């Protein structure tokens, strides 16, 4: 599990965190965090905390993180008020329950779509990098409609096969 936190500057995450995301951007097309759980905390004395948290949540989504919980907090005083304390306690309890459950969630249709587009493009060699082709050359990844060991129902498995067939050149 990870906790990602950022104060809000100019209605967005910090430049340092953005640089980290840019540095790790290969995870958008070589996902590997299928079993990870992430808590995102954004803070501000003004506005933009929800938007910044949602941006980070979207990044984690494309990296195929199993579970993401956001905790955007706006406070205008030196001390946290009771409302913010209640939010923090509620979200912390929810995240703790998720961690203790050890549950692996079924991926969304969007995750299955992106997984199979990248899988097909890499197997085809469609202008993707050498590292992408090497990642997707793993036999287990080549043969599955989503990462091995992740639960996926019949409808989503069929959807994954369809998407792969549309993008894969035989």
Model-assigned labels for residue ranges:
Residues 81-85:
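N-terminal beta-loop-helix "entrance" segment that forms/cooperates
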Residues 18, 57, 75, 96-98:
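Alpha-helical membrane-embedding segments
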Residues 1-66, 148:
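Helix-loop-strand module that forms the ligand-binding subsite of alpha/beta enzymes
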Residues 42, 51, 67, 87, ...:
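Generic detector of bulky aromatic hydrophobic side chains
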Residues 76-80:
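A short acidic, helix-capping loop that chelates divalent metal ions and anchors anionic groups
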Residues 65-74:
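Short beta-strand elements in bilobed, periplasmic/extracellular small-molecule ligand-binding domains
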Residues 86-170:
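C-terminal and late-domain segments of enzyme folds
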């Amino acid at each position: 599990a990870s906790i990602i936190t950022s104060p809000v500057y100019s209605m967005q995450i910090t430049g340092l965190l953005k640089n980290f995301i840019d540095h790790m951007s290969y995870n958008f097309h070589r996902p590997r965090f299928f079993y990870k759980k992430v808590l995102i905390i954004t803070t501000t004395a003004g506005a933009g905390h929800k938007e910044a948290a949602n941006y980070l949540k979207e990044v984690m989504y494309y990296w195929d993180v199993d579970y993401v919980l956001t905790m955007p907090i706006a406070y205008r005083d030196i001390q946290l008020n009771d409302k913010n304390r209640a939010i923090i306690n509620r979200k912390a309890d929810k995240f703790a329950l998720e961690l203790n459950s050890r549950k692996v969630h079924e991926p969304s249709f969007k995750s299955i779509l992106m997984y199979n587009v990248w899988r097909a493009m890499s197997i085809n060699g469609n202008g993707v990098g050498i590292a992408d082709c090497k990642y997707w050359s793993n036999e287990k990844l080549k043969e599955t409609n989503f990462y091995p060991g992740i639960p996926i129902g019949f409808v989503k498995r069929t959807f994954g096969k369809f998407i792969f067939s549309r993008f894969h050149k035989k």
